[in-house]
Curated annotation (Swiss-Prot):
Activated by calcium. Autophosphorylation may play an important role in the regulation of the kinase activity. Keywords: ATP-binding, Calcium, Kinase, Lipoprotein, Membrane, Metal-binding, Myristate, Nucleotide-binding, Repeat, Serine/threonine-protein kinase, Transferase. It is a lipid-anchor. GO terms for cellular component: cytoplasm; nucleus; plasma membrane. This is Calcium-dependent protein kinase 8. The active site is at D188. Ca(2+) 1 binds at D378, S380, N382, Q384, D389. Ca(2+) 4 binds at D486, D488, D490, K492, E497. Ca(2+) 3 binds at D450, N452, S454, Y456, E461. It comes from Oryza sativa subsp. japonica. ATP binds at L70, G71, R72, G73, E74, F75, G76, I77, T78, K93. May play a role in signal transduction pathways that involve calcium as a second messenger.
Length: 538
């Protein structure tokens, strides 16, 4: 239910988890959603509302001093917090009771505190120091984690060796094992919910954010769709699941650690859901041919679509790949992680070719606008843009990318790799950044590829269209494009699939953070109605 990391978060990111909690299915034993708030869940912070059953106290200031803001969300603010007597530093998440508008909001906070108190001390689970409640706020004093997210270390490091991936996976699964032994299902395991205690390489990894966690009894099944889409088990979409979902999510994280992208990826929520239901794991693209067979075997067993035969946390920890992790290869698996987390760089050659086609069909006004921008950036008036020229121009477009991302973007646009952008290279990247491509442009680009007018881009048409883009018509690249874009896996690309590719980016991390729980819940119902997923309970 919150991030106790010392790295500031945006309001959008900080508030996302709480918004999800507001949309949970109503408990039949509590007040229904469509009724006016009762005293148990007073909407506007009504005086007398008590959220916690057993708060540490009422006066936070008597023992702790709040410092600078670490993060802000819809329901509250996380501050640096210092214990007056010892000088020890913590994170304090102050949740405004005025913003707990429904009984479900109140129950979310209450349950998170109870779960964190219930869990025994563990080196890889963030600890709750104290929980105060006054007239206006609930204050959760927690262990301060200043080492950043697991995800960010993946990106910064650029790749993981198998040995490093095994060490991280062992930690994550040990957390799952501890939760399950104490009757807690996390339900939202993902790289963002694991923080490092400090910035040292030897820093312990800590599980955080128990806001979607729930107590469970052996054999109990749940129906509420929660979690983040790329880490969601198929039985969650089928609305019949138990603690096995945490092992699935840990398996998704392992897959990402080894190759840099989620195993079930698409550019639409429906595509993601369908990929999860199909549960076909790709071990063909790089760097998988270089990954050991024991590692791939563990991924397969953790991503078993049948929860009844999926490995338990205990079985995962006994798997040879983890049991003998120090014997695993310590050779880097390449730069796949960085390469695949880069939006424009990860854009496949089909999309780049399509952007060129669109550029040729721009209206005079659109073309003039881009030419004018290029001329303004080209301060030396030599028809070429340096990185500094490009950076200044992108800022003028209103895109505040960090320099590191801009460098990646420019490198991807710089087709001839001479370190500068000419006008044609600039046109393609401008269309991407400014999202100029409209439906008419996309239709023209699709028609360019669909030479036989069948309504599909077929493999032969793809080969012919990209003959100038690919040295020797590399079959691996052709097959990779089909795998990436062909979401219904019929071996060809429909207009809808092509349009989705053109309109969306490939930044799956951002998509994960912008996830709408209600939309995914509605999507589950839609897929059940159209027969994409069955109502079986396995």
């Amino acid at each position: 239910m919150g991030n106790c990391c010392g790295t500031p978060a945006t309001a959008e990111e900080g508030g996302k988890r709480r918004r999800r909690g507001k949309q949970k299915k109503a408990n039949p034993f509590t007040v229904a959603y469509n009724r006016a708030p009762s005293s148990a869940g007073a909407a506007a912070g009504r005086p007398g509302l008590m959220v916690l059953r057993d708060p540490t106290g009422r006066d936070l200031g008597a023992r702790y001093e709040l410092g600078g803001e670490l993060g802000r969300g819809e329901f509250g603010i996380t501050y640096l917090c210092t214990e007056a007597e010892t000088g020890d530093r913590y994170a304090c998440k102050s949740i405004s009771k005025r913003k707990l508008r429904t009984p479900v909001d109140v129950e979310d906070v209450r349950r998170e505190v109870e779960i964190m108190r219930h869990m025994p001390s563990h080196p890889n689970i963030v600890s709750l120091r104290a929980a105060y409640e006054d007239e206006d706020n609930v204050h959760l004093v927690m262990e301060l984690c200043e080492g950043g997210e697991l995800f960010d270390r993946i990106v910064a490091r650029g790749h993981y060796t198998e040995r490093a991936a095994a060490a991280v996976t062992r930690t994550i699964v040990e957390v799952v094992q501890m939760c399950h032994r104490h009757g807690v299902m996390h339900r939202d395991l993902k790289p963002e919910n694991f923080l490092y205690a400090n910035k040292k390489d030897s820093s312990p990894l800590k599980a955080i954010d128990f806001g979607l966690s729930v107590f469970f009894r052996p054999g109990e099944r749940f129906t509420e769709i929660v979690g983040s889409p790329y880490y969601m088990a198929p039985e969650v979409l089928k609305r019949h699941y138990g603690p096995e979902v945490d092992v699935w999510s840990a398996g998704v994280i392992l897959y990402i650690l080894l190759c840099g992208v989620p195993p079930f990826w698409a550019e639409t929520e429906q595509g993601v859901a369908q990929a999860i239901i199909r549960s076909v794991v790709d071990f063909k693209r790089e760097p998988w041919p270089r990954v050991s067979e024991p590692a791939k075997d563990l991924v397969k067993r953790m991503l078993d679509p049948n929860p009844m035969t999926r490995l338990t946390a205990e079985q995962v920890l006994e798997h040879p790949w983890l049991h003998d992790s120090k014997k695993m290869p310590d050779i880097p698996l390449g730069d796949a992680v960085r390469a695949r987390l880069q939006q424009f760089a990860a854009m496949n050659k089909l999309k780049k070719k399509a952007l060129k086609v669109i550029a040729e069909h721009l209206s005079a006004e659109e073309a003039a606008d881009i030419k004018d921008m290029f001329d303004k950036m080209d301060v030396s008036k030599n028809g070429q843009l340096t990185f500094e020229d490009f950076k200044a121009g992108i800022r003028k477009l209103g895109n505040q990318m960090p320099d590191s991302d801009l460098k990646i973007l420019m490198d991807a646009a710089d087709i001839d790799k001479n370190g500068i952008l000419d006008y044609q290279e600039f046109v393609a990247v401008s269309i991407h950044v400014r999202k100029i491509g409209n439906d008419e442009h996309i239709q023209k680009a699709f028609s360019y590829f669909d030479q036989n007018k069948s309504g599909y881009i077929e493999i032969e048409e793809l080969r012919e269209a990209l003959v100038d883009e690919i040295d020797g018509n590399d079959e691996d690249i052709i097959n990779s494009i089909i795998r990436d874009v062909d979401t219904d896996k019929d071996g060809k690309i429909s207009y809808d699939e092509f349009a989705v590719m053109m309109k969306a980016g490939t930044d799956w991390r951002k998509a994960s953070r912008q996830y709408s729980r209600q939309r995914f819940s509605n999507l589950s119902l839609k897929l059940q109605k159209d027969g994409s997923i069955s109502d079986d309970t396995q």
